[in-house]
Amino acid sequence: MQAINIIHSRFVPLQMENVDTDQIIPARFLKATTRDGFGKNLFRDWRYENDDESNPKAGFVLNDNNFTGSILVAAKNFGCGSSREHAAWAIDDYGFKAVVSSFFADIFKNNALNNGLLPVTVSEDFLQKIFQQ
């Protein structure tokens, strides 16, 4: 795990509230016990039609080349649901170094910190200003 000093990056906006860990990384992909390889299945059910990698869903932010970066900006209550550490692994393995939101589920926030992913909490007002950019 490397220390984060400064991140120079564009942000990727995910304007969905109450994103739970099963949406971040679906349970059917949790067979591995090492943290490598989970990024390809990040938001899998939102990214692909019929679970087919050759058929990306139009309009989903991770499928849009205009939105690339190492900072994920998510709506409030990000990482709710179960306590799976795999959610932080998948976000990190995809290439995100930080997640910005107005509220994180406590277990997700701790898992992120313990695994080198930086959760940044901002006010809801500030978060909405980011989304408007």
Name each model-derived stretch.
Residues 1-37:
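N-terminal, positively charged, Ser/Thr/Ala/Gly-biased leader segments
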Residues 10-12, 22, 69-72, 97-99, ...:
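Structural motif
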Residues 40-70, 74:
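Active-site-flanking structural segment that lines cofactor/substrate pockets
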Residues 65-96:
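Glycine/serine-rich anion-binding loops at beta->alpha junctions
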Residues 95-108:
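A short glycine-rich beta-strand->turn/loop micro-motif centered on a GG-aromatic cluster
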Residues 105-121:
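Active-site-proximal loop->helix
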Residues 116-133:
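Acidic, glycine-rich flexible loop/linker segments
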